[in-house]
Amino acid sequence: MPPPNSAPPAQVVFVTGPSGAGRSTVINALEDLGFEAIDNLPLSLLPRLLEGAPPDRPLALCIDPRTRDFDARDLIHAYEKLEQDPAYTADLVFIDCEPATLQRRYSETRRRHPLAPDADPADGIAIEREMLAPLRTRADVLIDTTPLTVHRTRDEVIRLFALDRAPAMSIQIMSFSYRRALPISADLVFDCRFLRNPHWAPELRAKDGRQSDVQAYVAQDARFEAFRTQINAMLDLLLPAFKEEGKSHLTVAFGCTGGRHRSVTLAELTARRLAEEGWQVSKRHRDVDKDASENSDRDRGASARTAASTDDGEAEQP
């Protein structure tokens, strides 16, 4: 037993099982729960990985039977050695699936089995099951994915390893300029270009939607409150649903012409509200500084053109 005042034991979870059963789904779910995940770790590197002080974060180690030095007995030995170390708690998780379902999955994806690339997938499945049999017998946790979808597999991992905590879904609130195209990472996009534009108020043009007077100007649009209310209602519906489905990251983007005033205003207000409700929120104003520099360049160019036109005796059109 560790001394009473020492740090709690570091958690290490070994994940293994046949190809196609869902190892990657499980290791990704553990990573979303806060584990430091290492995929396809060769067993020969395990001692070096665990040298020194125990890690601060729990470890999830995916052991692939296709790796060159794989041996079920060596993995069991490494696991049992770690299990006896008071500085660690260890779990051996076996991801299983019925051979017929594995064969169907290979057929649907038209992939070859890695252990029998030139033969029927059934041959590779049989070879792998024999290799892994001792691990299946020794496992602390067995997850049979035969009847499970990807989402239900994730839910099972969460149930087993989150200690009744749902995984945090990180939400990024972004503002952007339509002149620079839609952000490809956005899951939800709201177009703010119909709202009144502070760009045309000289005292606000150089400011942005992070400032209260710009926000107040945008909020004076008669449609603003209804627009914001509808957005809030939609997010109240969708965010819990996305979280329930196992989504770990969500990007909500607000766009306007320059990405400086209206989109930033809505992004700021939405991020503040979600944070107050307990969501894990980050903000990114993608184009706000670019818009400022471009406006400055345009103003200098306009001044130069005005001066040139005045010299020629012509007035420049606004």
Curated annotation (Swiss-Prot):
Annotated spans, Disordered: 278-318
Pfam families: PapZ_C, RapZ-like_N
Binding residue positions for GTP: 64-67
Family: Belongs to the RapZ-like family.
Domain of life according to the entry: Bacteria
Gene Ontology terms, MF aspect: ATP binding; GTP binding
Native source organism of the sequence: Jannaschia sp. (strain CCS1)
Gene3D superfamilies on file: P-loop containing nucleotide triphosphate hydrolases
Name used for this protein in its record: Nucleotide-binding protein Jann_0539
